[in-house]
């Protein structure tokens, strides 16, 4: 690992860690692929309908590829702050050349890059919002709302933190059964795995808090569309009659 610290920059701008992340692609697809396809189905577009979506914190593009495959006339803008992730993603996105572009965007700031249009049809996120502070989560949801066309949808797939210690123990017990390797990493982590875990849980918050952030931003149709233990797919839409 390039640095023995666990900030977002040290983790996700590390050549070593991003290399490990890329090498884990098959396991990531096995663990999360069904949810990415489900998110593609949640977007309210016909199979042959043309639309543009932004994928924030896109990493190497797993979610974008699921949407692009499901909706063959869609176009993706993938946003990430890590040159290393973008480099790996460019290689993985090649089957969709001409239908996507990458843009650099640090979600810890409120400044949206000009390469993301003022209005897009949908905005999705996967495995990234939990890395942001509460203040930035709220700010990001407001920014997403502002960048959606009226009727546009936002869908997020992310882990959440339980508020009840009994629930926490159940999640951990069942999660260990589903994925023994994750149990091993928690109980006997390498220095890199410990840094990634600390980074993973630092800003994780309960689901109800995030749904309130969506309501405060102005979304409607808010729901938890899928859930298994700490993993959730939730979202909402900008009202169709909202001023552009």
List the model feature ranges, each with a label:
Residues 124:
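A conserved beta-strand element that flanks and buttresses the S-adenosyl-L-methionine
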Residues 54-56, 60-110:
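Class I SAM-dependent methyltransferase SAM/SAH-binding core
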Residues 127-128:
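Short catalytic micro-motifs in class I SAM-dependent methyltransferases
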Residues 138-150:
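A short glycine-rich, Lys/Arg-flanked "PGG" loop and its adjoining helix->strand segment in the class I
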Residues 157-217:
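C-terminal alpha-helical "lid/dimerization" subdomain adjacent to the S-adenosyl-L-methionine
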Residues 220-244:
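Core SAM-dependent methyltransferase catalytic element
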Residues 109-117:
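Short conserved loop adjoining the S-adenosyl-L-methionine
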Residues 1-47:
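Conserved class I S-adenosyl-L-methionine
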């Amino acid at each position: 690992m390039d640095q023995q610290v666990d900030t977002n920059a040290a983790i996700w701008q590390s050549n070593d860690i991003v290399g490990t992340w890329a090498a884990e692609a098959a396991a990531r697809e096995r663990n999360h692929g069904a949810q990415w396809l489900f998110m593609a189905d949640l977007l309210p577009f016909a199979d042959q309908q043309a639309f543009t979506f932004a994928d924030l914190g896109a990493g190497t593009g797993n979610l974008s590829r699921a949407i692009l495959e499901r909706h063959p006339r869609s176009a993706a803008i993938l946003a990430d702050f890590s040159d290393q992730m973008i480099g790996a993603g460019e290689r993985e996105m090649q089957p969709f050349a001409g239908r996507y572009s990458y843009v650099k965007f640090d979600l810890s700031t409120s400044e949206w890059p000009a390469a993301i249009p003022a209005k897009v049809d949908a905005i999705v996120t996967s495995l990234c919002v939990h890395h942001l502070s509460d203040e930035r989560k709220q700010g990001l949801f407001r920014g997403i709302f502002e960048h959606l066309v009226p009727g546009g949808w936002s869908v997020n797939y992310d882990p959440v933190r339980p508020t009840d210690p009994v629930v926490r123990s159940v999640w951990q017990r069942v999660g260990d059964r589903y994925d023994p390797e994750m149990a091993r990493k928690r109980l006997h982590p390498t220095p890199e795995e410990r840094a990634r875990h600390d980074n993973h849980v630092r800003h994780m918050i309960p689901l109800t808090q995030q749904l309130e952030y969506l309501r405060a931003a102005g979304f409607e149709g808010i729901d938890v569309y899928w859930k298994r233990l700490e993993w959730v797919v939730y979202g909402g839409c900008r009202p169709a009659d909202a001023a552009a």
